[in-house]
Amino acid sequence: LVSLLFAGTALAQEHNPGSVQPDTIQKSSEKSFRKQRSPRTDHGPVGINISLWKNISTQRTDTIGSTCFNLGVFSSMNRLNGLGMNILGSVTGRDVNGVQMAGLSNMVGGSMRGMQIAGITNINGNNLIGVSVSGLVGITGNHAQGVIISGLANISGDYNRGASIGGLLNISGEGASGIHFAGLANISGGNFKGFSGAGLLSVIGEDLNGMQMSALTNITAGDMTGVQVSGLGNVVGGTARGLQIGAANMAIRAKGLQIGLFNYYKEKLDGFQLGLVNANPQTKVQLMFFGGNATKLNVGARFKNRLFYT
């Protein structure tokens, strides 16, 4: 009987050369299903989230849905496209497009486009485009563009473009541009274009195009094109093009004007130094001894730069 079955199968395949094996049919149907299946989208159903706590709400937390209106004590959502208001805070797994307000904190895993207001902190895992106001700290993982105001510190992992106002600190991991005010310090890891004003310290990791102003010290590791004004010192690690005003001004190369008690350049000066002591590696220090009616002996020093003494 088994032999007859095998023989019948062989004859059927010979008379039907277009027939295919069952596994071939299954693979073909799977390919056809893949072609017919619509591409996956992250934009799922839209709903209203009235929430007391995570998973105690009118909208369950998933990975595809989005929320158009959120009101609660503490809320957890996938995506917010609209308005969210919470007494304590909210956690959004992906992006926010709209307005978020919370008594304590707003946390967004993706990008924020719109306005955030929180009593303590706003945290965005990716980018921020818009306005962020927090009582203590505003944190953006990558780019921040817009207006950021925090009572303590604003921190951007990458580029910061716009107006950043921090009670103590503004920190940008890469470059920054715009207007930065801080009660203590402005720190930019890359280039800075614009105005940086700090109560104590302003530090730029690469080049400055604009103005630095601080009560204590301005430091630019690369070139400076613009103006530096400080109560104690201005330091430029490359070429200073423009104006330096401070108790001490130092640059590798100076092209412009240095005004201070002590002015120094290392390699080249194309400009003018106005100060009590103007120095460079070629400056000659000459000691002077002299006497008078009031004092029998006086000792002084003068610094000679080419044809000028200070």
Residue ranges and their predicted role:
Residues P17-T310:
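Surface-exposed, glycine- and small/polar-enriched segments that build interaction surfaces at terminal
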Residues L1-S19:
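Bacterial Sec-dependent N-terminal signal peptides
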